[in-house]
Amino acid sequence: MKLASIDAFYDDPKLVWEWYEDRRKNILDVKPNEGHFAISQMEEFKDVVILTQNIDGLHQRSGSTNVLELHGSIIRIKCTVCDFADNITENFESLPPKCKCGGMLRPDVVWFGESLPQNIWQSAIKEASVCDVMVIVGTSLVVSPANTLPVYAKQNGAILIEVNPEKT
């Protein structure tokens, strides 16, 4: 986790990029599981919004269309200087990659020491506040501020369903 910080990126961007490139390639080899597909199939019958801390893009690859990625996506890049952002579609010739403006590109993920993107966070609060049912899957609910989203749902009278092998 030492490399998952803004400080590590500016200290050694090449090392951080090598680590993320390895993770990205591994993630691209992984297929969505039955749970991902079940959630995407629910969209055919109900209004489903996915609020996820995962950065792997598996929800979208399973067919889900309304996904709020609180911690960003390892499949996207953004510039450290300008507003450029895009999906990663090919391997980079050298690391760290450079933007057309000359700035360094970085993985579009939230690192330790950074805040969540405010537009995504505000959308997540809104969705949690108006949902009828919130299904919480595979999280310990210890990472703040995402762990407050069930509180917003419960304050609105939503039913909370937790699916987790460990007690939280």
Question: What does each model-found stretch correspond to?
Answer:
Residues M1-T168:
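Conserved catalytic core of sirtuin-type NAD+-dependent deacylases
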